[in-house]
Amino acid sequence: MNPRRKKRLTLAVALIVGVSAIASLLLYALNSNLNLFFTPTEIIHGKKDTGVMPEVGQRIRVGGMVTIGSMVRDPESLHVEFAIHDISGGEIIVTYDDLLPDLFREGQGIVAQGVLSAPGVLQATEVLAKHDENYMPPEVAEAMGQTHEKLDYNQEQKSGGY
């Protein structure tokens, strides 16, 4: 092999190795920043279509309804624990160490983002409550089997009268 060909081959191999390394690092970074959405039932039994279950230590988003009577507050700190459930009956525990949103209450739809600290236990870093009594995050509405219903106004409401 002449020196010119050897130099080209070395350059081509170095270029392929460099592009492969960059692609690997990019995919690793994207995977570590990926937050998959799950319902409580999917956390317990896996997703219906793929059977994928979140692993302990994985960052995820969970949506469901706060179970009535499940909220436990620590009087000495901001720590709070509550359960969320979905229409399929799955229920998980969410722990949170910060102030809950003003609109948070039992029986309401929420989305919690955090790390799965144990099977069925989410250590939340963020809790989002719905905006009003008619709003539900799209992921939660889909998981709960609900669809958006358009509000019907009567003529008096449309004309501005109460």
Swiss-Prot record:
Biological-process GO terms, alphabetical: cytochrome complex assembly
Q: Could you give one GO CC term from the UniProt record?
A: plasma membrane
User: Which sequence ranges are listed under topological domain Periplasmic?
Assistant: 30-162
Positions bound to heme: 131, 135
UniProt cross-references to Pfam families, sorted A to Z: CcmE (PF03100)
What is its subcellular localisation? Cell inner membrane
Major subcellular site: membrane
Under InterPro entries, the record lists: CcmE, CcmE-like_sf, NA-bd_OB-fold
**Which residues lie toward the Cytoplasmic compartment?**
1-8
Keywords, A to Z, come to: Cell inner membrane, Cell membrane, Cytochrome c-type biogenesis, Heme, Iron, Membrane, Metal-binding, Signal-anchor, Transmembrane, Transmembrane helix
Protein family (similarity comment): Belongs to the CcmE/CycJ family.
Q: What is this protein called?
A: Cytochrome c-type biogenesis protein CcmE
Give the originating organism: Shewanella halifaxensis (strain HAW-EB4)
